[in-house]
């Protein structure tokens, strides 16, 4: 902790790749009429300054050091809006002591990338006459391009009924919402800001950005809650990529390739299956992919069908030992089981049975089904999940359906089922930091879901058909049209690499996808892995695949894992699949880039574009590339990044190019 001199002192610290400047304020400066004082956190990317005047804290300025541009501000740092009474703000609350500047220690074993990096933080404590205490922090990690602000609100001896928490209210020329839904950040040329919560809201009015979160329940006496916001700086023309770098640092777990089998459409389709079925499929995939073709399998997801719906999240009689034998068998292939659970109870007939069982046991429900935010059901559901980790070593959960986002259940500590789901995931990660969490139905493309979950649902039906061609070609078109319309257009800052796309489908219970008479499976596989998605699901009945199908699957899965560091940059290019327009995905890294294009039409199509636009090349990047087809001829072609290039695509062709800078 730095020492405070009589008037003020300036502390200048230099470490690899960053420079931090702090101005400390003397306690004497808090007297009425004292001149304003300032303190700053800064590195090579971003600088932020706050002012202390008359015992209050305000923003002063932000500088984007990539562009040398500065935003001036005199805004409050936080405002807490009570349901009754006066607003609690960074200017109105009593500051208990001068700002403290301290180290942010690294946590080398954390599952979160940012926590592994040291940095510095400013901290101030506030209090009001009623005993409400607020701890404000501003944090800057070494080598990052953003500053996070965190506010922890401690209620005193009485509950604190708050309606809204405001953490962003600044002048931001050119500001616009990145998407229409909740949890959408605000962007402005080379800046981004946001309230780090998927249920948050932002508004832009006359170049001023405001972000807040609404609350229904009071903060209970003696309890505390923490909220956070981010302000980031980007390079010119690199808004998406630099925002993605922030998200990759702060998300619950960094991007990772997670290849696994899913039993839906194969073992069960609203049917019950048993231990023997599960062990057999583990062996089938393990032998074909791991033993014969040296593919790394991460998990085996057992979807709806493992439980007895009349008992509520207990195994059906076909699993006398639970997942014990499945876990043992999966371990022989260096994998582990995953499990499907539906917080709201699932779907159709099994859901009705689960609801009947829940009501008989006194668990809370709402119009969507089971209420995860209900005190009794939350404890039961959490304990069921914990048992899956402790007893069977599951390494992923598929949480299918999270219920209401607005209704408060009587006696609950949560504002909604979504709020309860977020809290549950936090508890599970404390138990098993590398657990994979797939949060499906009910989500939407707010990037802030990834502060909790690893992936969310793309939207739409599990599978359906759009466009023209064979059933498999029309399924591919449908899948990708849902990505385009539900995510690319609605939440462009949500990374495609973290969507649940509903996988590869070649299964006995999958409507019109239980065979492949047109031999289009390779197109599905190549396009799927070309998206860069980390949640790599195989809805596959193993006996339906030919040796050639297994070879294509294995080759592509290994290609994806090998190129993971490139593919995590995956972003959409081209048009609307449903309109039969050429589209695809592009990924860039310093040493290699990947371009995947698909023609959803039964007619040849040309696609003309500049490579620097497709790859969103940074200013100092290579301007010429050698391109090689990943799945075709070894022949290569040189492409200039600055000149328009025409790609000729055959009907339904999937073209994957690996690009090496020259």
Segments from the language model and where they lie:
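Acidic-aromatic substrate-binding/catalytic surfaces of carbohydrate-active enzymes
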Residues: 36-123, 176
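Conserved structural scaffold segments of CAZyme catalytic domains across common CAZy folds
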Residues: 99-338, 342-352, 533-578, 587-593, ...
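Active-site-proximal substrate-binding groove within the catalytic cores of carbohydrate-active enzymes
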Residues: 62, 222, 421-634, 646-656
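Active-site groove signature of glycoside hydrolases
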Residues: 294-306, 380-411
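Bacterial N-terminal signal peptides that target proteins for export
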Residues: 2-18
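Active-site-adjacent "subsite" loops/lids of carbohydrate-active enzymes
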Residues: 267-272, 336-392, 403
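Bacterial N-terminal signal peptides
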Residues: 16-27
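Boundary at the C-terminal end of the N-terminal hydrophobic targeting segment
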Residues: 29-33
């Amino acid at each position: 902790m730095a020492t405070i001199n009589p008037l003020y002192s300036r502390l200048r610290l230099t470490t690899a790749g960053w420079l931090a400047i702090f101005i400390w304020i003397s306690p004497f400066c808090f007297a009425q009429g004292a001149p304003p004082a300032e303190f700053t956190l800064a590195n090579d990317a971003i600088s932020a300054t706050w002012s202390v005047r008359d015992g209050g804290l305000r923003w002063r300025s932000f500088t984007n050091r990539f562009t040398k541009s500065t935003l001036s501000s005199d805004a409050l740092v936080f405002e807490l809006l009570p349901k009754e009474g006066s607003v609690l703000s960074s200017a109105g609350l009593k500051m208990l002591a001068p700002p403290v500047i301290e180290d942010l220690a690294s946590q080398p074993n954390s599952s979160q990338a940012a926590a592994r990096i040291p940095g510095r933080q400013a901290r101030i404590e506030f209090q009001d006459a009623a005993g409400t205490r607020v701890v404000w922090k501003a944090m800057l990690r070494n080598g990052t391009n953003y500053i996070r602000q965190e506010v922890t609100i401690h209620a005193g001896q009485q509950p604190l009924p708050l309606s809204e928490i405001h953490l962003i209210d600044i002048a931001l020329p050119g500001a616009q919402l990145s998407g229409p839904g909740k949890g959408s950040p605000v962007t402005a040329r080379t800046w981004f800001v946001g309230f780090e919560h998927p249920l948050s809201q932002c508004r832009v009015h006359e170049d001023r950005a405001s972000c807040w979160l609404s609350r229904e329940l009071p903060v209970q006496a003696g309890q505390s809650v923490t909220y956070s916001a981010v302000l980031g700086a980007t390079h010119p023309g690199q808004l998406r990529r630099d925002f993605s770098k922030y998200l990759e640092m702060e998300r619950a777990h960094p991007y990772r390739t997670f290849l696994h089998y899913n039993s839906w459409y194969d073992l069960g389709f609203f049917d019950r299956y048993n231990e023997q079925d599960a062990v057999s499929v583990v062996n089938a995939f393990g032998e074909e992919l791991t033993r014969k073709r040296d593919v790394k399998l991460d998990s085996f997801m057992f979807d709806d069908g493992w439980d007895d719906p009349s008992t509520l999240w207990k195994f059906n009689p076909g699993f006398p030992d639970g997942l014990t034998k499945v876990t043992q068998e999966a371990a022989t292939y260096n994998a582990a089981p995953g499990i499907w659970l539906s917080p709201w109870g699932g779907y159709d007939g099994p859901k009705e049975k689960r609801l009947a069982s829940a009501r008989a046991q006194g668990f809370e429900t709402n119009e969507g089904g089971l209420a995860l935010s209900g005190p009794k059901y939350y404890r039961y559901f959490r304990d069921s999940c914990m048992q899956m980790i402790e007893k069977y070593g599951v390494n992923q959960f598929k949480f299918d359906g999270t219920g209401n986002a607005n209704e408060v259940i009587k006696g609950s500590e949560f504002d909604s089922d979504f709020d309860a789901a977020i809290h549950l995931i936090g508890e599970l990660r404390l138990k098993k930091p590398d657990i994979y969490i797939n949060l499906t139905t009910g989500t939407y493309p707010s990037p802030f879901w990834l502060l909790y979950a690893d992936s969310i649902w793309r939207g739409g039906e599990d599978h359906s058909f759009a466009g023209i061609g064979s059933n498999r070609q029309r399924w591919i078109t449908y899948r990708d049209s849902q990505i385009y319309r539900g995510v690319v257009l609605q939440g462009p800052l949500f990374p495609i690499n973290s969507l649940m796309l509903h996988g590869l489908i070649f299964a006995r219970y999958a409507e019109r996808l239980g065979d492949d008479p047109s031999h289009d499976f390779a197109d599905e596989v190549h396009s799927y892995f070309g998206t860069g998605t980390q949640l790599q699901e195989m809805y596959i009945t193993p006996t339906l695949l030919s040796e050639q199908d297994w070879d294509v699957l294995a080759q592509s899965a290994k290609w994806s894992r090998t190129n993971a560091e490139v593919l995590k940059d995956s972003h959409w290019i081209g048009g609307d699949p449903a309109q039969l327009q050429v589209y695809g995905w592009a990924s860039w890294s310093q040493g290699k880039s990947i371009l995947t294009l698909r023609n959803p039409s039964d007619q040849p199509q040309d696609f003309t574009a500049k490579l620097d636009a497709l790859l969103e090349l940074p200013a100092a990047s290579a301007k010429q590339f050698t391109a090689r087809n990943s799945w075709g001829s070894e022949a290569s072609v040189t492409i200039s990044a600055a000149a328009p290039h025409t790609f000729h695509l055959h009907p339904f062709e999937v073209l994957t190019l690996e690009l090496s800078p020259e």
